[in-house]
């Protein structure tokens, strides 16, 4: 059985979020939370919140044991891009892309043995 949690339209660039997601993929949830707490990146608390949601979903919806959970899938997709403009010299303007992310974490119970 697997439980999933998704955070959509999170205001962080997917490239930056992927750096953190790559650290926890395939790890046990306790170890992953410890890694996230000690990673000095802006994406860490956001991903930790999604991971805690996935653990709660597994516990509540599927009666899984939180101590036996492993992160089987963890990925970041691109969300919508908010376009903004920065004024420049001589009446010009430059476009700023404020990127958003869709963060998905899937947890499964560890196989015995």
Curated annotation (Swiss-Prot):
InterPro entries: Ribosomal_uL22 (IPR001063), Ribosomal_uL22_bac/chlpt-type (IPR005727), Ribosomal_uL22_bac/org-type (IPR047867), Ribosomal_uL22_CS (IPR018260), Ribosomal_uL22_sf (IPR036394). One of its GO terms (cellular component) is cytosolic large ribosomal subunit. The keyword RNA-binding applies. One of its GO terms (biological process) is translation. The keyword Ribosomal protein applies. Coiled coil: none annotated. Keywords: Ribonucleoprotein, Ribosomal protein, RNA-binding, rRNA-binding. This protein binds specifically to 23S rRNA; its binding is stimulated by other ribosomal proteins, e.g. L4, L17, and L20. It is important during the early stages of 50S assembly. It makes multiple contacts with different domains of the 23S rRNA in the assembled 50S subunit and ribosome. The globular domain of the protein is located near the polypeptide exit tunnel on the outside of the subunit, while an extended beta-hairpin is found that lines the wall of the exit tunnel in the center of the 70S ribosome. Part of the 50S ribosomal subunit. This is Large ribosomal subunit protein uL22. It comes from Halalkalibacterium halodurans (strain ATCC BAA-125 / DSM 18197 / FERM 7344 / JCM 9153 / C-125) (Bacillus halodurans). The lineage of its organism: Bacteria, Bacillati, Bacillota, Bacilli, Bacillales.
């Amino acid at each position: 059985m697997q439980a999933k949690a998704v955070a959509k339209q999170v205001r962080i660039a997917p490239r930056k979020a992927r750096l953190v997601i790559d650290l926890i993929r395939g790890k046990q949830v306790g170890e992953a939370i410890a890694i996230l707490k000690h990673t000095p990146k802006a994406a860490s608390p956001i991903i930790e919140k999604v991971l805690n949601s996935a653990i709660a979903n597994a516990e509540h919806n599927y009666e899984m044991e939180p101590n036996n959970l492993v992160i089987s899938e963890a990925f970041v997709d691109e969300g919508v891009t908010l376009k903004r403009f920065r004024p420049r010299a001589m009446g010009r303007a430059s476009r700023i892309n404020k990127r958003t992310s869709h963060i998905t974490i899937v947890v499964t119970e560890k196989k015995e043995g």
